[in-house]
């Protein structure tokens, strides 16, 4: 792997932001390696390196096996069995030691030591990949908690494991201690931002997109990224918040909650293309907004939280754009919409038909009288030109002899339209 790619995948700081830390780093690298052909080998090699820096043997095996399938000749594609045996013994010894230590605390009824013993054991289980045992150990800490700070720390531990387990529904309950912190507490702002981001990820996982959007846009950019970088990065907040808002908010909401939101605008500075897309939508340049987003679709398909939602979010944004585009008009030509939203390629007519059928667009497509409408317009244009010529002749004190032909300008109906049209109800 060259130095540039190594920096991209493994550096702590990149593009002016703090990249996520903890177990989610491996998740993201491994996901990219399994999802992208161009980045496959480099991402999997970085995942192997990340796994080997920790204690999770199963993750190491998964990364090496995937790399072997993609690039069997790479040195990292061969299992380091000596490391695996050594790490397995180390993990086993550590587990036995921590369990014995905890049992001693229980025998001596030392409440604070029991809490810390469960925490140490839970973190150890988390590090070696036994997230169920980790959750169990953290859960046992509840009875020994004696302060608000300890309750908050426990909530963050439970949230971290719940996110890894994709147990979205439990996250809200685990965050209650963070949300109940008094605003006068110096840590309140940081804790509430952590809570907003975690709640946003959980709502996204449950397809509650508008709720998730508000969670992300209400996060404070003044909070150091180190507070929440085990679950997300500032760049994630900008992307998730921006995309979800575009899919669920109208133009006024986008302006008020994102562009006029000083705190969220700081997040958007890290992902300027998202800010441009939002600005284009708010200004009514919907096709430009969609074009920007489409150019970044491959990147979002590599995100561990966004990937499965990208098709739905993009479809919702496109539907919203079409509806907003049609709003000022009572009638629009299909070829005009084709140029605005599709360009060369399949007709937009089928898409509009589906939107009308699903009740997303209150309109109808007039494709029956198009020939008559086209002929009528041609007649109208011809008669209009004749009338202009006649007015010019009269203004020049000239005279045109001849009878008035039937079907003059006053006989032309003004309500006819050209080609296939969309008529808005």
From Swiss-Prot:
Key words of the record: Cytoplasm, Nucleus, Signalosome
Pfam family, one: PCI
Subcellular location: Cytoplasm; Nucleus
Family in the record: Belongs to the CSN1 family.
SUPFAM superfamilies: Winged helix' DNA-binding domain
Organism field: Neurospora crassa (strain ATCC 24698 / 74-OR23-1A / CBS 708.71 / DSM 1257 / FGSC 987)
GO CC annotation terms, alphabetical: COP9 signalosome; cytoplasm
Keyword Cytoplasm on entry: yes
Record text on subunit structure and interactions: Component of the COP9 signalosome (CSN) complex.
Domain (PCI) ranges: 219-379
Protein name: COP9 signalosome complex subunit 1
Main location as per UniProt: cytoplasm
Function: Component of the COP9 signalosome (CSN) complex that acts as an regulator of the ubiquitin (Ubl) conjugation pathway by mediating the deneddylation of the cullin subunit of SCF-type E3 ubiquitin-protein ligase complexes. The CSN complex is involved in the regulation of the circadian clock through its control of the stability of the SCF(FWD-1) complex.
């Amino acid at each position: 792997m060259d130095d540039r790619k190594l920096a991209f995948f493994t550096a702590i700081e990149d593009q002016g932001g703090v990249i996520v830390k903890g177990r989610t780093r491996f998740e993201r690298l491994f996901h990219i390696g399994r999802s992208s052909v161009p980045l496959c080998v480099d991402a999997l090699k970085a995942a192997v390196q990340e796994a080997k820096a920790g204690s999770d043997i199963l993750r190491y095996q998964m990364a090496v096996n995937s790399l072997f399938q993609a690039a069997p000749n790479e040195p990292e594609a061969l299992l380091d069995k000596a490391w695996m045996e050594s790490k397995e013994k180390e993990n086993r010894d550590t587990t036995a030691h921590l369990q014995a230590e905890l049992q001693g605390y229980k025998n001596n009824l030392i409440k604070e030591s029991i809490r810390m013993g469960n925490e140490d054991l839970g973190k150890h289980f988390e590090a070696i990949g036994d997230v169920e045992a980790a959750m169990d150990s953290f859960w046992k800490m509840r009875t020994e908690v004696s302060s608000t700070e300890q309750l908050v720390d426990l909530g963050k531990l439970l949230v971290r494991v719940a996110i890894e387990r994709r147990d979205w529904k439990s996250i809200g309950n685990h965050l209650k201690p963070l949300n109940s912190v008094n605003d006068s507490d110096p840590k309140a702002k940081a804790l509430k931002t952590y809570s907003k981001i975690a709640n946003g990820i959980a709502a996204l996982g449950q397809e509650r997109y508008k709720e998730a959007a508000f969670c992300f846009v209400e996060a404070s950019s003044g909070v150091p990224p180190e507070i929440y970088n085990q679950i997300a990065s500032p760049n994630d907040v900008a992307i998730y918040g921006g995309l979800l808002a575009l899919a669920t908010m109208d133009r006024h909401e986008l302006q008020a909650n994102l562009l006029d939101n000083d705190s969220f605008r700081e997040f958007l500075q890290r992902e300027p293309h998202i800010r441009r897309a939002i600005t284009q939508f708010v200004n009514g340049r919907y096709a430009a907004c969609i074009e920007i987003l489409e150019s970044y679709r491959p990147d979002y398909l590599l995100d561990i939280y966004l990937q499965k939602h990208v098709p739905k979010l993009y479809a919702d944004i496109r539907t919203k754009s079409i509806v907003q585009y049609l709003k000022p008009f009572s009638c629009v030509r299909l070829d005009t919409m084709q140029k605005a939203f599709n360009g060369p390629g399949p007709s937009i007519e089928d898409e509009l038909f589906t939107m009308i059928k699903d009740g997303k667009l209150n309109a109808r497509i007039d494709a029956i009288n198009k020939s008559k409408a086209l002929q009528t317009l041609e007649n109208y244009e011809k008669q209009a030109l004749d009338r202009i010529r006649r007015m010019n002749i009269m203004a020049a004190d000239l005279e045109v002899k001849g009878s008035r032909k039937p079907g003059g300008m006053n006989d032309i109906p003004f309500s006819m339209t050209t080609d296939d049209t969309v008529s808005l109800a």
